[in-house]
């Protein structure tokens, strides 16, 4: 059986923590920022964990992470 391929798009967007959770950056911070408050933009800078409902699918497209 051939090797499984890693989704390169996902590999660039997610990192695995020491405990095996997937860390990601938040969306909505590339443009149209003038109507967002400073507090909102500051909170968007923080990384967050991937939701548990998506972890099963993420493990399939990131087999070696």
UniProtKB/Swiss-Prot annotation:
HAMAP family: Ribosomal_bL35
Range of residues in the leader sequence: none
GO annotation, biological process: translation
GO CC terms in record: cytosolic large ribosomal subunit
Organism: Agathobacter rectalis (strain ATCC 33656 / DSM 3377 / JCM 17463 / KCTC 5835 / VPI 0990) (Eubacterium rectale)
Keyword Ribonucleoprotein annotated: yes
A Pfam family that the UniProt record links to this protein: Ribosomal_L35p
Encoding gene per record: rpmI
GO molecular function: structural constituent of ribosome
Family: Belongs to the bacterial ribosomal protein bL35 family.
Record-given protein name: Large ribosomal subunit protein bL35
Keywords: Ribonucleoprotein, Ribosomal protein
Record bears the keyword Hydrolase: no
